[in-house]
Regions:
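RNA-contacting regions in translation and RNA-metabolism proteins
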Residues: 1-174
């Protein structure tokens, strides 16, 4: 680093170089912030807003970061509208040439597990365990459950009173 003596030392080229160095530093800091923020969220369900739909791929915005829900990770027959809120499973955070890539899925088997942990506190507290999940995305899902507490009905805790939890869960996945 050097110190400029007078204002005459500030030429057009020097000003542009300084601007580029500052902008590069800002971009690097932004990349690091996004990587640290979303690297911790890898393997969880995230909420976002649909920004645009490009050739079947859905671009989802999460504040200062965007993620990609590719066509193969979408539930068949599901339609997406720009501006709609959506939940998706963040299965990969990668550093690419053009920034941080967030890869999302709505068909991943872990998506169901994470949704159950959100909807049913018994699953989050590990009182009820999900032993196995079989899923045909968009059609049906089967879940084998087990209770670690004899006083808690594992099926009832996931279905909820009058099916309230099952309805909320079903509306999220289809």
């Amino acid at each position: 680093m050097f110190v400029l003596e007078t204002e005459e030392d500030f030429g057009r080229v020097a000003a542009q170089t300084a601007k580029q160095v500052i902008m590069q530093g800002i971009r690097e800091a932004e990349r690091e912030r996004v990587l640290s923020e979303y690297g911790d969220k890898e393997g969880t369900v995230v909420n976002g807003t649909i920004q645009k739909i490009d050739r079947g791929n859905v671009i989802i915005e999460f504040g200062r970061a965007t993620g990609m829900l590719s066509k193969k990770e979408q539930i068949p027959g599901e339609f997406y509208k720009q501006g709609a809120r959506i939940k998706a499973y963040l299965y990969s955070v990668e550093e690419g040439a053009r920034g941080i890539n967030l890869w999302l899925s709505r068909t991943h088997p872990q998506f169901l597990l994470e949704l159950f942990a959100i909807e049913a506190p018994e699953v989050a507290n590990e009182v009820v365990e999900l032993k196995a999940i079989a899923r045909e995305p968009g059609a049906r899902s089967k879940v084998a459950v087990w209770s670690n507490d004899e006083g808690i009905d594992p099926i009832g805790s996931l279905v909820g009173q009058r099916g309230v939890r099952a309805i909320a869960f079903s509306s999220t996945t289809s």
